[in-house]
Design a protein with these regions (language model features):
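Short, solvent-exposed loop/turn segments enriched in Ser/Thr/Gly
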Residues: 73-79, 150-151
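Short, solvent-exposed beta-strand/turn "edge" segments of beta-rich domains on protein surfaces
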Residues: 58-76, 88-93, 126-131, 142-145
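Intrinsically disordered, low-complexity Pro/Gly/Ser/Thr-rich segments with frequent PxxP/GP/PP motifs
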Residues: 109-147
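Terminal connector regions
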Residues: 140-194
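Short acidic, flexible loop segments centered on an aromatic residue
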Residues: 88-112
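Long, contiguous binding/interaction regions
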Residues: 1, 22, 29, 60, ...
């Protein structure tokens, strides 16, 4: 992609003015796309526990105005995708997500919000996942203007055997501040909204 961008800039410089604009527009669009991909990568994580793959991605969605002397809050949405990568016939072939636990830290690494491990379900449900099944949900949390990070665990019950339950890790992912707000102060108290 970098070579494509460079080629379009070079071609735009050598082209007639009428032909240069589309080439330069394409190069700039590719650069914006790369920046967006880099930001998404920085706010994503993936972890696999006993064949359960948990992918997480977050995005800043809003800055809330302070209310009655309280500091302003910023809200992030996050997407969690849980995939059962266990093959048919394996001991962990049929699974159910039964609980969750979250730790949200501010940009300095201080605890900001917590959902205790064992809190029932995810977004009001306890999905069952057969082999190759996937369940995806969206939720939100708040944090100060500087952002922070989030990590946790999903309690998973094995349905087909005496496998009991285990915790599937949700690897730490960033709550990145919006570019216009980066470097500004912020604080606030908040909670994960599930």
């Amino acid at each position: 992609v970098g070579k494509l961008i460079l080629a379009n800039f070079r071609a735009g410089a050598a082209a007639a003015p009428a032909d240069a604009a589309p080439l330069l527009d394409a190069a700039l669009a590719a650069m914006r796309s790369l920046a967006g991909q880099a930001a998404m990568e920085a706010a994503s994580s993936s972890a696999t526990t006993r064949g359960v793959v948990v992918d997480a991605t977050s995005a800043h969605v809003a800055a809330l105005e302070p209310a009655r002397g309280a500091p302003g809050r910023h809200v992030w949405t996050y997407r969690i995708r849980v995939t059962n990568a266990n093959p048919p016939g394996s001991p962990d072939a049929s699974l159910q997500v039964v609980s969750r636990g979250w730790d949200v830290q501010d940009a300095a690494g201080r605890p900001h919000a917590r959902v205790p491990p064992g809190s029932r379900g995810v977004v009001g449900t306890t999905p069952i996942l057969g082999p190759a099944d996937c369940f995806e949900y969206f939720s939100s949390t708040d944090c100060g203007a500087q952002g922070g990070s989030m990590e946790g665990r999903l309690g998973v019950a094995v349905l087909e055997s005496a496998g009991g339950t285990f915790d599937a890790a949700v690897a730490r992912f960033a709550l990145r501040p919006p570019p216009a707000r980066a470097g500004r102060g912020g604080g606030g108290h908040g909670s994960e909204s599930e």
